[in-house]
């Protein structure tokens, strides 16, 4: 029996010279209307802010039909979770942790001290956020990899206090694979709460039944569905957030030298995440485009998540973009600003060097997106929906605050006093200059008047 053919759209830009604005309008892009769920999520956030842990558990019962015995997962439950995993899964998690830690440790910036003039020193200090809440979603798949991608950078940044929140499953606790990942990472504070109510509880904190304090966090990170994203938006005046993440997306920039079978596999792999996932092929080869679509039609129906894949690949957010040449493809890729961008061209490194807008760039056939999803060492929490044009993925830097420390002595202040006084007068703020004059015109080294 022949399976239905994918409705993989095709946009032909050949013979045209679209502007950046036109490209952004014409390239495949799904819509995630966070505003549409704000009326649903705002009452949840309000209820948790007022009612704390009890309200969060009641909301979880209402939506998911599960109520854990407590918000905080007992240590013995976390410890026991590792024993539920097969040895190869434990080994895979440990290898992924090792690689992600190696990279994120190496990229932690050092403090930098600069003497901008004699007697004038400015230092940039990198100070970790004190307490962070990391969300690990449930839903279509279990994501221990998201625990790794959030926890490791925070640890390497030096965050003192970490809590992971993840929705309870049928047994009343988060999925054992998520708990096992927490154990392997040394995270001992896990909350069995999910959805928008988890974000609100992380932001506002509470006193749990029995008197245990659920301390609020300073920052919330991690992926989630549209309701989690809306809760992040509503709580961002209380806590910092990493981003408002939309459905996952992959763009592949390829020429006729690319392997159609491998590209088809890669486009399908991201489509299995979500029915709204975007899979886009940008190419100057119509022959390659035809081959990739044919391969996807041959393969999608035998994947475990075939219905989800078919809906994602047939959605308005997915399709082929035909361009005149790779230079035009680069312009299209930069206008699109993909979460994940694979480069399959003869000069893949040269092309990659010209990409300015992408959450992560994967060079060549041996660097596929699934590698980055799990164990390349890079992070898989990346900007979506075109926000790679101005935002970065999660990393050690996400959990560090850059603080400038100004340390001038008398010589340094006198050397720049006239500049400050002149500028303050020019802006109509003379008191600023007077604060300088008070130190340079009458002060001696003891700070007393001459």
UniProtKB/Swiss-Prot annotation:
The keyword Secreted does not apply. It catalyses: L-histidinol + 2 NAD(+) + H2O = L-histidine + 2 NADH + 3 H(+). Binds 1 zinc ion per subunit. The active site is at 339 (proton acceptor), 340 (proton acceptor). Keywords: Amino-acid biosynthesis, Histidine biosynthesis, Metal-binding, NAD, Oxidoreductase, Zinc. Its EC number is 1.1.1.23. Pathway: Amino-acid biosynthesis; L-histidine biosynthesis; L-histidine from 5-phospho-alpha-D-ribose 1-diphosphate: step 9/9. PROSITE patterns: HISOL_DEHYDROGENASE (PS00611). Substrate binds at residues 248, 270, 273, 340, 373, 427, 432. Zn(2+) binds at residues 270, 273, 373, 432. GO terms for cellular component: cytosol. Disulfide bonds: none annotated. Gene3D superfamilies: 1.20.5.1300, Nitrogenase molybdenum iron protein domain (3.40.50.1980). One of its GO terms (molecular function) is histidinol dehydrogenase activity. NAD(+) binds at residues 135, 197, 225. InterPro entries: Ald_DH/histidinol_DH, Histidinol_DH_CS, Histidinol_DH_monofunct, Hstdl_DH. Catalyzes the sequential NAD-dependent oxidations of L-histidinol to L-histidinaldehyde and then to L-histidine. PANTHER family: HISTIDINE BIOSYNTHESIS TRIFUNCTIONAL PROTEIN, HISTIDINOL DEHYDROGENASE HDH. This is Histidinol dehydrogenase. It comes from Corynebacterium jeikeium (strain K411).
């Amino acid at each position: 029996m022949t399976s239905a053919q994918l409705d993989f759209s095709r946009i032909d830009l050949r013979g045209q010279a679209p502007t950046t604005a036109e490209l952004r309008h014409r390239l495949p892009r799904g819509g995630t209307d966070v505003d549409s769920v704000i009326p649903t999520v705002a009452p949840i956030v309000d209820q948790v802010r007022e009612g704390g842990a009890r309200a969060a558990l009641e909301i979880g019962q209402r939506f998911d039909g599960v109520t854990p015995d407590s918000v905080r997962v007992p240590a013995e439950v976390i410890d026991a979770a590792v024993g539920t995993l097969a040895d190869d899964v434990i080994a895979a998690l440990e290898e992924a942790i090792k690689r992600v830690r190696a990279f994120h440790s190496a990229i932690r910036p050092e403090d930098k001290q600069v003497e901008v003039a004699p007697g004038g020193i400015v230092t940039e200090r990198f100070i970790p956020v004190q307490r962070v809440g990391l969300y690990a979603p449930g839903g279509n798949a279990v994501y221990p990899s998201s625990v790794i991608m959030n926890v490791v950078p925070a640890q390497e940044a030096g965050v003192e206090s970490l809590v992971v929140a993840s929705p309870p499953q049928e047994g009343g606790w988060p999925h054992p694979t998520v708990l096992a990942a927490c154990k392997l990472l040394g995270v001992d504070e896990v909350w069995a709460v999910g959805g928008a109510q988890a974000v609100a509880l992380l932001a506002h904190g509470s006193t749990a039944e029995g008197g245990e304090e659920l301390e609020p966090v300073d920052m919330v990170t991690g992926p989630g569905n549209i309701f989690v994203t809306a809760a992040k938006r509503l709580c961002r005046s209380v806590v910092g957030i990493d981003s408002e993440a939309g459905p996952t997306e992959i763009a592949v920039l390829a020429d006729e030298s690319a392997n159609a079978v491998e590209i088809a596999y890669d486009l399908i792999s991201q489509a299995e995440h979500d029915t709204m996932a975007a899979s886009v092929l940008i190419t100057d080869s119509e022959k390659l485009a035809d081959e990739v679509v044919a391969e996807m039609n041959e393969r999608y129906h035998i994947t475990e998540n075939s219905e989800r894949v078919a809906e994602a690949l047939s959605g308005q957010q997915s399709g082929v973009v035909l361009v005149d040449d790779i230079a035009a493809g680069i312009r299209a890729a930069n206008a699109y600003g993909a979460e994940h961008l694979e480069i399959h061209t003869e000069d893949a490194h040269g092309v990659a060097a010209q990409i300015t807008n992408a959450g992560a760039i994967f060079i060549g056939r041996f660097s596929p997106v699934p590698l980055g999803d799990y164990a390349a060492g890079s992070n898989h929490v990346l900007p979506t929906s075109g926000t790679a044009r101005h935002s970065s993925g999660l990393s050690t830097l996400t959990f560090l605050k850059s603080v400038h420390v100004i340390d001038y002595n008398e010589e340094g202040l006198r050397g720049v006093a006239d500049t400050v006084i002149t500028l303050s007068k020019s802006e109509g703020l003379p008191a600023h200059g007077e604060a300088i004059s008070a130190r340079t015109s009458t002060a001696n080294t003891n700070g007393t008047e001459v």
